[in-house]
Amino acid sequence: MILTRRQSLAGLAGGALLGTLGAPAIVRAQKKPQIGIVVKIGGIPWFNAMEVGIKKAAEEQGVDAWMVGPTQADAAQQVRAVEDLIARKVDVIGVVPNDATALEPVFQRAQAAGIKVVTHESPDQKYNDWDFELTTAQGYGDAHMELFAKLMGGEGKYIVYVGSLTVPLHNLWADFAIKEQKEKWPNMQLVADRFGVAESMDDSYRTALDQLRAHPDLKGILTFGSQGPIGAARALEERGKEKSVVLVGGFSPGQGVKYVKDGTIRGGFIWNPMVAGEVFVRLSTNLTKGQTPTDGMEIADVGPVHVDPAKRLILAQKLESLDKENIDRLVTMGL
């Protein structure tokens, strides 16, 4: 069964599909389901694109869904945002966590209040109902390292950025990438512990400058976090290192297109944050109807969905290449 944007992500577990995830809601007299989605930080292109998907799916579903964007990538701000949504008595709270552990107590309070909790980019999250991912952790980490190692010629010194040292998924991507490097490209050398700066363009910029000074022979920067490539690219161009240092990572295409076209960012991979926003709303809407995802379903434009009920995890694998051949198409899509 193929699920379009107007069809269900999942049927009822072990039974017939009683509703559809993505189908327009029938207008009823009762209050529309309320869905609040808290992202890592507001005002950056990645989450702006996610908000477009949230709004689109909300209209499609006939629900009230909105995005809450903290002013900083700060765990305490996310906790306060979730507390506010609990006080509003919403039906579902969605979160892209900055710090999975810091959110556990407030997620417990949400569930105690009868509110469903859905996360993204936090596959081992506690006290949520479901987490969904549009790539597998190993697939994402390995894809980046394979490209990175090829461009570095399989040798040389490199550093790694993640969005934060407390974002589990970013660190899992880095773990898989580094493991892949050690197994396949032993002549590459990680010269520092990973840096938790890639949700801030300014921090990524400053860290790149610092590491270029500390390691004049640095040959590569691999970054997981959408602002990492942008900040590092600024630093490389400022220091005249854009040709000698390989820069690879995921970012919002509209923000990084200039650096791809001039060769400073050599490539990377992303999933579509607009689709992630849509899935947030569709999954949440189905949960308000008592429906549960089932293994083997497909999402249009994403592909097959693997559902692991024991881990409360929904997995797909759909990556877009951030290279000169594909970047304009992604920018045209509004990413």
Model-derived features: positions:
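A residue-level marker of the well-folded mature domains of exported/periplasmic proteins
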Residues: 8-10, 28-335
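N-terminal export signals
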Residues: 7-27
